[in-house]
From Swiss-Prot:
Start and end residues of each stretch annotated as Disordered: 116-157
Region (G2): 363-367
Main location class: cytoplasm
Record organism: Rickettsia conorii (strain ATCC VR-613 / Malish 7)
Keywords: Cytoplasm, GTP-binding, Initiation factor, Nucleotide-binding, Protein biosynthesis
Domain of life of the source: Bacteria
Family, per entry: Belongs to the TRAFAC class translation factor GTPase superfamily. Classic translation factor GTPase family. IF-2 subfamily.
UniProt keyword Repressor present: no
SUPFAM superfamilies, per the entry: Initiation factor IF2/eIF5b, domain 3 (SSF52156), P-loop containing nucleoside triphosphate hydrolases (SSF52540), Translation proteins (SSF50447)
InterPro entries per record: EF-G-like_DII (IPR053905), EFTu-like_2 (IPR004161), IF2_II (IPR044145), IF2_N (IPR006847), P-loop_NTPase (IPR027417), Small_GTP-bd (IPR005225), T_Tr_GTP-bd_dom (IPR000795), TF_IF2_bacterial-like (IPR000178)
Keyword Cytoplasm included in the entry's annotation: yes
Record's protein name: Translation initiation factor IF-2
Coiled-coil region list: none
Amino acid sequence: MTDNQEIKPKKLTLGNSKLSLNKSFDSLTGAQSFVNAKSKTLVEVRKSSTGSATTLSLNKERNSLDQTVIDANKEEFNRRLSILKKAAEQSQLNDPLKISTLSKLASINQSANSKIEPLETDKEVEQKQQNTEENKVEVSAKIVQDDEDIPSQIPKKKEETFVKSPLVGKRTRYGIESEKELDKTAESKIIAPKIKLEEPKKFKKADLFNMLSDDESGSGRTRSLAAIKRAREKEKRKLVSQAPEKVYREVTIPEAIGVGDLANAMSERVADVIKELMKLGILANASQTIDADTAELVATNLGHTVKRVQESDVENVLISDDKVEDLRTRAPVVTVMGHVDHGKTSLLDSLKSTDIAAGELGGITQHIGAYRVTLADGRAITFIDTPGHEAFSEMRSRGAKVTDIVIIVVAADDGIKTQTVEAINHAKAAGVPIIVAINKIDKPDIDIERVKNELYVHEIIGEEAGGDIMIIPISALKKINLDKLEEAILLIAEMQDLKANPFGSAAGVVIESKIEQGRGTLTTILVQRGTLRNSDIIIAGTAYGKVKKMTNDKGLEIVEATPSVPVEIQGLNEVPFAGDKFNVVQNEKQAKDIAEYRMRLAKEKKISIAPRSSLEDLFLKASGNSKIKELPLIIKGDVQGSVEAISGSLLKLPSDEIKLRILHSGVGPITESDVSLAHASSAIIVGFNVRAGANALTAAEKEKVDIRYYSIIYHLIDDIKAIMSGMLDPIVREQYIGSAEMRQIFNITKVGKIAGSYVTKGIIKKGAGVRLLRDNVVIHEGKLKTLKRFKDEVKEVREGYECGIAFENYQDIREGDTVEVFELIQEQRQL
């Protein structure tokens, strides 16, 4: 063994603290190993066992190695610092924030250098750029080349502990084993310690924010993320709170508008609109309605422009003109009018060869029917059958408005009647041609000339007499002269040149409407222009909806209807009135707007025509001494026209003491809500061709509500008239029954004066009313207190007998006075 064994060079790396040798080696010192925490490189140092001389040489070499590492770290730091300063100078004008950041990083690096912690420089290199690793490799390689077999110990950070490999050696009786053997043994037994590496700390936003937000005073206060979020939200609130630029709009103002609606139209606050109204001297809330002039002033004061529109403009979409080239010839619409039982429906029955009249109760048509008859030559005629009863004058007038020709049916054996005259007046008012059909000429003992003379009285002059009205004798039952009637209709239609536009949106008139269980609202309409198709959206009065199904007068389902074709449709949301015009619109919103406008008009009209009560009537009603009685009614019918006819007839019943009040009228069966309303108002429910449901009947029995059913209209009117007559106060009439002459006066104790009398005429009844006449002057009127025959009390004494008479609370009687006896009789009044 030699004292100076050659030590193989080992790879060195940068440590995190100053290299030092804290422990001296003795002769038994063996090999040591250590691990750098960053490079994880195992360094093995062989120790010489030659004594103190070897130890001194090792210490010198180790000190020189330490100085070399420190110098390399300083050079690396200075190089990086110069790069950072140059970058800061170049971007000084562009990014001052980045310069401050680099300055702070430079100060951090300088403080780390003052503590001589080379490992700190390695951390910065790892965080910044990759070329730092290359510099580290170059420095490590240089150290490995200059120094060989230098044992050293590199201390870690103060939180890390030194790890040493145990001394490896074997004593023998002759001393320690040879150094070479010792080195081999040490190499085989050196174990690399497991060191837990510390992960680099993550760089958070708060750290960067703290570095950037530190003021010059160097307070170094750390801001939390919550504080940063609060600051950001505060900035956002400041931005939101900034008033946006006001937008001025063009405001459309109708005839009346609510304050809230006006504010929405201008995109203004309701409070601002109310302030403007207060400036004008108007106190209003958000739900109050103001007129168009006031709304225009408010909008102008707020800087908006105003566009005035009429509320009726919503109906402008319904108005359209037809082009001449689009017009096509259409079938005539004929209305049949006349008195009850003069043969109107029988005439249509003969024309259609169907038994329509068999379905009419009492032989009276209860509602309008629309039928289309196709003749042998292919031409068609549309007939509208109107009821003849006087209650249906409103329906008849509507029928005259939609017709082209009017046929007035007059019975040859009955002549002109009240409803006949009314039908003539309706036809004249409508300005349509008239054809008179004198029916029932097959009956014996008829006088057609007498009927013609009666027509002359009403200015209905036939062609044979120089007039322009065609008078045709017919027999609907025997089908006599029906062909002449059809020829007359077609001739007049040809002279009128009836045309319509079958293209475009449909329009027409509602003939009748009703509610049918399981099918909903059914409406009979007559198309006057355009073509009506399934799924069209129509508006009729205040009712609107989509056409779900169409059927013709024969009950067959069809997909479209052209002008002069009557159809029954279903799909409306409510029952329209007979005579209402219908139009097809583009969408449901348009229909809804028009319906709402019409409902407002109807409501305003109803309020304006409401009966006004005098102050005296109000006081009498409040005290319960009102002389006017009320009969509340609820009317339900099968079709709208019948309900209107019933209401109109009942309201025409004359009475100054009874006021007929119709609480509700509608189409459909009697419901439980109708019963509840009747119970609350003590009303009578009238059902015309409808019945009450099971629940309604149960409720009516429980609440004792009177429900009456009718199928013929004049029976209903007579019954209501009788009820109103029963409510009238009866007439009290005085009926004379007899007289007596006083012949002698008797004074009886405890009784008073009794007149001995002789019955001269009629009978004297006890309890009847009496008048005492003296010299033909009435001096007292009262009642008989006592009536005696001799000593017996009797109820009456007839003519020619004597009796004793005493008066109630009256004693001034004399001989020769005359007594008249009478009774008060109550008679029921009639309307």
